[in-house]
């Protein structure tokens, strides 16, 4: 269990806001070379933005946790850097591993808000089906079978997401809080999510703080999340993850 019960000193958005304006880069961790712990706070993709923010937050809560150690613990299976296959590539794998470590928990429907949610099942296969999209897999064909073995743990996985059609509701009607991690569910075969960021409530409307490809940097999107998703036909809604001490 992680030391996440130390004195609370601020919310996650305070730390996330430090990255506003930092340039966006696609695939910040992807490369064909040997795996190493990479921490680049000058260029962020959507995952490293969330990951580094949470790692800073964890380290600031407890003197026994370092920032670098927190990044490594979140990013790698069992917190050990042991090649490309030890990195938690899929959002669902990343969430499961760090839920078990006590970092966060994924929200699921309650009796009161069940009407806001959709249930589905998920089978991961995208990486093994598209190795040419990943520099390491393209250069090391032998690793594809190992990725497929990891994916096999996520066949017909039950998931719940909040429907995008209700994301225009206010903070008293949605279970989403400031600082929750929001992940955009996708209908792309074999993939779980395509993007993630933090929930930000502004004037009782939900927005996304994220490393944005369109803006080329970390922003609080000026569009509401409802409007942002209205043009994303492959996204039916969002999964919601809450950091443990933010509960």
Locations of regions flagged by a protein language model:
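Short alpha-helix capping/helix-loop boundary micro-motifs
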Residues: 160-172, 186
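Bacterial Sec-dependent signal peptides at the C-terminal "C-region" and cleavage site
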Residues: 1-9
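Acidic/His-rich structured neighborhood in mature extracellular/periplasmic domains
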Residues: 24-159, 201, 209-213
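Sequence/structural signature of beta-propeller domains
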Residues: 9-20, 29
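Extracytoplasmic/periplasmic, Sec-exported soluble proteins
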Residues: 8-12, 38-46, 63, 174, ...
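C-terminal soluble interaction/assembly domains
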Residues: 177-247
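Beta-rich nucleic-acid/ligand-interaction surfaces
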Residues: 70-74, 168-174
């Amino acid at each position: 269990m992680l030391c996440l019960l130390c004195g609370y000193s601020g919310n996650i958005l305070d730390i996330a806001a430090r990255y506003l304006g930092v340039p966006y880069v696609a695939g910040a961790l992807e490369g064909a070379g040997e795996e190493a712990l990479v921490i680049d706070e000058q260029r962020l993709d959507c995952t490293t933005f969330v990951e580094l923010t949470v790692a800073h937050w964890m380290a600031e809560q407890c003197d026994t946790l370092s920032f670098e150690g927190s990044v490594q613990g979140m990013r790698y299976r069992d917190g050990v850097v042991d090649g490309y296959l030890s990195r938690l590539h899929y959002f669902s794998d990343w969430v499961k591993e760090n839920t078990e470590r006590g970092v966060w928990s994924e929200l699921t429907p309650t009796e009161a808000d069940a009407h806001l949610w959709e249930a589905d099942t998920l089978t991961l296969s995208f990486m093994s089906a598209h190795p040419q999209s990943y520099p390491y897999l393209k250069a090391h064909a032998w690793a594809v079978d190992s990725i497929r073995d990891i994916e096999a743990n996520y066949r017909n996985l039950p998931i719940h997401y909040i429907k995008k059609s209700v994301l225009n509701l206010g903070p008293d009607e949605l279970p989403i809080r400031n600082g929750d991690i929001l992940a955009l569910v996708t209908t792309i075969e074999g993939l779980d999510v395509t993007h993630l960021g933090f929930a930000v409530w502004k004037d009782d409307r939900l927005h996304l703080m994220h490393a944005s490809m369109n803006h080329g940097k970390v922003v609080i999107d000026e569009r509401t999340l409802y409007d942002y998703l209205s043009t994303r036909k492959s996204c039916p809604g969002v999964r919601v993850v809450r950091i443990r001490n933010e509960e």
